[in-house]
């Protein structure tokens, strides 16, 4: 399995600044068994949020913590 933290940052870097990604995109990028990779992705996302490197949202609204469905974006994006 590839590092999920690096995969999040790499996928975001390939998108427009205001784009978001789905956590399952990250899991699919790092492991053939993407569902099995989801816990590692969630943990990596929690760390990236804590470090201020990404932000979370759902349906265009910011989320302060990961709970339920979410999208991952660059910090400061609306």
Question: Each predicted region: which residue ranges?
Answer:
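Residues that form generic nucleotide/phosphate-binding pockets
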Residues: 11, 29, 44
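Charge-enriched amphipathic alpha-helical scaffolds
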Residues: 36-57
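Positively charged, polyanion-binding regions of nucleic-acid-associated proteins
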Residues: 1-20, 40
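Short helix-coil junctions and helix-kink-helix linkers
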Residues: 27-38
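Short, cationic-aromatic polyanion-contact patches
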Residues: 59-78
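Long, charged, low-complexity intrinsically disordered regions
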Residues: 1, 36, 76-78
């Amino acid at each position: 399995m590839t590092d999920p933290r690096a995969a999040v940052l790499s996928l975001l870097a390939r998108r427009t600044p205001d784009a978001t990604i789905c956590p399952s995109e990250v899991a699919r990028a790092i492991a053939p068994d993407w569902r099995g990779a989801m816990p590692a992705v969630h943990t990596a996302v929690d760390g990236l949020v804590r470090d201020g490197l990404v932000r979370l949202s759902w349906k265009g609204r910011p989320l302060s913590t990961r709970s339920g469905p979410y999208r991952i974006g660059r910090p400061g994006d609306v």
